[in-house]
Design a protein with these regions (language model features):
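Bacterial Sec-dependent N-terminal signal peptides
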Residues: 1-17
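Structural preference for beta-rich elements and adjacent junctions enriched in aromatics
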Residues: 12-374, 379-383
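Outer-membrane beta-barrel proteins
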Residues: 53-55, 151, 217-219, 241-245, ...
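Membrane-embedded beta-strand positions in outer-membrane beta-barrel channels/transporters
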Residues: 64, 104-106, 160, 228, ...
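Structural signature of outer-membrane beta-barrel domains
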Residues: 83, 186-188, 236-238, 274-278, ...
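Outer-membrane beta-barrel translocator domains and adjoining extracellular loop/strand segments
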Residues: 91, 134-136, 194-196, 241-246, ...
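Surface-exposed extracellular loop regions of Gram-negative outer-membrane beta-barrel proteins
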Residues: 222-268, 366-434, 495, 500-505, ...
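Exposed, low-structure sequence patches enriched in small/polar residues
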Residues: 329-331, 337, 405-406, 420-604, ...
């Protein structure tokens, strides 16, 4: 199957006829949201194509984009035309706002033209900035924040976004004069999403498989020396007057540094880092049998972090950076990552944590190495090695002794992405190494997905060994075999108020390694999507679980169910999402039915409301 699919990836690149020829700015440009005279000599990218609600016509709203560059960075101006006096829809002034709840304009860049990795910048109509890293062909990591400048100005018939992006902010290879480029606009009042280079409606406008081409009149200037130093000093004192203890003093000193080894290869250094400014996790009540996953938000781990953190699947991660530095302070860390050339990416990281006497946590050293090779049009093969070593405490008399002095993982992964993005998938194998553990320590998993306008068909299977151990990873469940097919069919409507009807069927089956069923979920859903982007969903589901460990489904009543007990229940539910054009938007969902206990029913209603600001245009 893979050989057949790969023949697709040799086909002609999509949208290569959409070319933007960028040239040097004829003069200084002030970033103020005004279209000054210098912009008159730049090429204009216009005639956007509608993506949603339908991708079969030109956009109804007019957008014009122009670009320049100078010795230090890129200039961009986006002129977003509206009806005379039309108000702008804005939900938040927060950086990296919610895409679907704000009128916005976004830029997607692929400096290596590999259709896999890139950068995104943009703004909503109120001027809130958006920036992130693109990976896996079009997924965006918005935890990445960097330095650049932008401004928004309002007019009666348009709003203008102007930006300047320094070359030091992005990563690119010197000498490459062909980049991937895409412009995207969302106008909520018109219920329209559009893009410069056409994108099929089933894909996000961030899809790097459908970018146009940015053609430089000469190779982009060298970014020059790029070194950032962030030192910190943290002092304080504390005293327990009740216990009358001595005053404790705190004096912490640390340093973070970022060094551009080349324009595409970056070195991050950290000594006694301080993560007190990192955004806190969203609070979640865990009613599941397994550990929850929270995303990495520490900037040290973000850039090119997909090479490490995205290896595998959401529940099979051989490396999870949040395992490092949360239960023991970090002494130091170094990370070298980036592009070697168009086809090769690499990442190397080494970190060491301090010894914690109270918890008997020894000094730990962590190493991760990843390398990735592009193959065919957009696919790649990746290798990952992860190592944790205990540096002290090998003597059993030492209070920090650990029975597991080391843990290692090595894995190989193939990521499939056809040139038109219709076929995607991956296959990976992993093996772990630990003291006094051998046999049944392999893991393998694979999936394949087909995404067309009318069909979304997928299949995934996983097999995790009983002895497989990823101490620096996230693998909440072991010793199982899983299969998960799914299929969705979209029926487009000729009714002017309805976009589509969607029927979706999913099934999840977990087995023991001897193929005895332990978990099953069968799910059927119907979704009605209106032209104004409101959606209404109704679903039914059947669940079966055989508990492998004692479990309290309520997490607080101590009604613990015994290991080996079997539980079946049926449930129904709904979800109502209002049209985003309303001043007060809502999302209401409900679930009714069984849940573990035969003599009890579960009813859950959730409701969230948001106020969307309508900002009047002004001259």
């Amino acid at each position: 199957m893979l050989i057949t699919l790969q023949s697709i990836s040799f086909s002609q690149r999509k949208n290569e006829e959409f070319k933007y020829f960028i040239k040097r700015s004829p003069g200084q440009i002030i970033i103020d949201g005004k279209e000054d005279v210098n912009w008159s000599t730049a090429q204009t990218a216009t005639d956007f194509t509608m993506v949603l609600p339908m991708d079969t016509s030109k956009a109804k709203v007019r957008t014009e984009v122009k670009m320049f560059y100078d010795t230090a960075g890129l200039y961009l101006i986006a002129i977003n035309y509206i009806d005379h006096g039309q108000k702008f829809m804005v939900e938040s002034l927060k950086r990296d706002f919610s895409f679907g709840k704000n009128d916005n304009f976004l830029l997607f860049m692929d400096p290596f033209n590999d259709q896999t990795n890139g950068f995104t910048f943009g703004s909503n109509a109120a001027g809130a900035q958006w920036d992130g890293l693109l990976y896996e062909g079009g997924k965006a990591d918005l935890n990445w924040d960097n330095k650049w400048n932008s401004a928004v100005k309002y007019y009666e018939d348009k709003w203008i976004w102007e930006a300047y992006i320094p070359f030091k902010t992005i990563r690119y290879k010197n000498g490459i004069t062909i980049w991937g480029i895409q412009f995207s606009r969302l106008d909520i009042s018109k219920a329209e999403k559009s893009s410069w280079a056409p994108v099929p409606r089933q894909f996000p406008t961030a899809s790097l498989a459908y970018t146009g081409i940015l053609v430089w009149d000469q190779p982009p200037p060298d970014a020059g020396q790029n070194i950032s130093l962030i030192p910190y000093v943290l002092t304080g004192l504390s005293k327990n007057y009740t216990a009358n203890t001595a005053t404790k003093f705190r004096n912490d000193v640390g340093l973070d540094a970022k060094v551009a080894v080349t324009s595409s290869l970056n070195l991050d250094l950290s000594i006694h880092p301080d993560f007190s400014q990192v955004e806190v996790d969203r609070q979640v009540t865990n009613l599941d049998r397994f550990e929850l996953f929270f995303p990495e938000r520490r900037q040290f781990f973000i850039e090119n972090g997909d090479q490490f953190n995205n290896f595998g699947y959401s529940t099979i991660r051989p490396f999870f950076s949040r395992r490092i530095g949360l239960n023991a302070p970090i002494q130091y860390g170094a990370r070298l990552s980036g592009k070697l050339n168009k086809n090769w990416r690499m990442g190397f990281m080494n970190m060491q944590t301090e010894r914690v006497i109270n918890t008997k946590t020894p000094i730990q050293n962590y190493t991760a190495f990843a390398i990735q090779r592009k193959v065919f049009a957009r696919s790649n093969i990746g290798l990952l090695f992860v190592n944790r070593d205990q540096l002290l405490g090998k003597d059993e008399k030492d209070p920090s002794y650990s029975a597991n002095p080391f843990n290692r993982n090595i894995g190989l992964e193939y990521n499939l992405a056809s040139s038109n993005n219709l076929w995607t998938g991956k296959y990976m194998v992993l093996k772990s190494f630990s003291k006094n553990t051998s046999g049944d320590d392999f893991t393998h998993a694979g999936n394949i997905q087909y995404s067309s306008k009318k069909w979304l068909i997928g299949y995934q299977q996983e097999s995790v060994g009983k002895q497989y151990t990823a101490e620096v990873g996230y693998v909440p469940r072991k010793d199982y075999f899983k299969i998960s097919p799914s299929i969705s069919r979209i029926f487009f409507s000729k009714n002017p108020k309805i976009t589509s009807h969607t029927i979706k069927v999913m099934n999840f089956d977990y087995f023991t390694r001897k193929l005895k069923l332990t978990d099953n979920t069968t799910y059927l859903a119907y979704t009605l999507t209106l032209r104004n982007q409101a959606t209404y969903t109704a679903w039914v589901a059947h669940d079966y679980i055989k508990l492998l460990q004692p479990f309290d489904p309520t997490n607080y009543t101590k009604d613990t169910l015994a290991r080996g007990t079997q539980h079946r229940w049926n449930s129904v539910g709904f979800e109502l999402a209002s049209k985003p054009q309303q001043l007060l938007t809502y999302l209401i969902s409900g679930r009714f039915g069984g849940y573990y206990f035969k003599d009890r029913k579960s009813t859950r209603l959730n409701s969230s409301h948001e106020w969307i600001s309508r900002m009047p245009s002004s001259a």
